[in-house]
Design a protein with these regions (language model features):
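N-terminal Rossmann-like FAD-binding beta1-loop-alpha1 element of flavoenzymes
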Residues: 29-70
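Conserved small/polar residues in nucleotide/adenosyl-binding loops
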Residues: 177-183
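Conserved N-terminal/central alpha/beta ligand/cofactor-binding core
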Residues: 2-11, 29-31, 61-176
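Generic helix-packing signal
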Residues: 50-51, 160, 181
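Short coil-to-helix leader/linker segments, especially the first N-terminal amphipathic alpha-helix
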Residues: 5-18, 46-52
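A short, basic/flexible loop-to-alpha-helix module at the beginning of a structural domain
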Residues: 14-31, 56
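A structured beta-alpha segment of the ubiquitous adenosine-cofactor-binding alpha/beta core
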Residues: 23-24, 134, 169, 182
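Short polar catalytic/cofactor-binding loops
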Residues: 39-41, 76-77, 183
């Protein structure tokens, strides 16, 4: 019988450590309508799409206050902690930017074909036919996630998203029957 670390989690009181009333002075707070934590592609896409939806409904936009959408990023700016390359399915970008040409996206182009080889030794390469599903990327775009993050952050700022770089979200603030985030 084996023992796993998950069976012995450290004692954490979630209610005290992660949720609480506001503690900072009023003059050090920024009231925002919606706070999005994380400046990766998902958080940035969320901020951009939300700003698109709010642009269609002025009443809701006005009800969210002076800063309707804020994105909290622990790095210097969005993309600063994103290191890898990726295969990107273009469907989300097409939905997010329907009027934009794929040539304008920050990618290195599309994958023209898929081929996977096994190399049993230095002299031999055996193609796997058909290509296993996890390795099928035909039609996907090759991109740098850091470059994509920086590009999306530019579009988010153009859409009116307030980006708080070098800011860590540490606690969810609960006050006056609404959620607040402590940064």
């Amino acid at each position: 019988m084996s023992t796993a670390p998950i069976e012995f989690p450290p004692p954490v009181d979630s209610a005290k450590e992660f949720v609480g009333p506001p503690t900072d002075p009023e003059d050090e707070r920024i009231e925002v309508g919606v706070a999005i934590v994380g400046g990766g592609p998902g958080g940035l896409a969320c901020a951009i799409r939300l700003s698109q939806l709010l642009a269609e409904d002025e009443a809701v936009l006005d009800s969210l206050g002076e800063v309707p959408i804020a994105l909290v990023e622990k790095g210097k700016g969005p993309g600063s902690h994103l290191l890898s390359g990726a295969m990107m399915n273009p469907s989300a970008m097409k939905k997010l930017f329907p009027d934009m040409s794929e040539d304008e996206w920050p990618t290195y182009g599309t994958v023209p074909r898929d081929t996977v080889y096994l190399f049993p030794n230095r002299k031999r390469a055996i193609p796997l036919k058909p290509t296993p599903p996890p390795f099928r990327n035909h039609g996907n775009h090759v991109t740098s996630v850091a470059q994509l993050g920086r590009w999306l952050s530019g579009h988010a700022e153009e859409a009116g998203v307030y980006i708080l770089g070098e800011t860590a979200a540490t606690k969810l603030q609960i006050g006056r029957a609404s959620c607040r985030e402590r940064v």
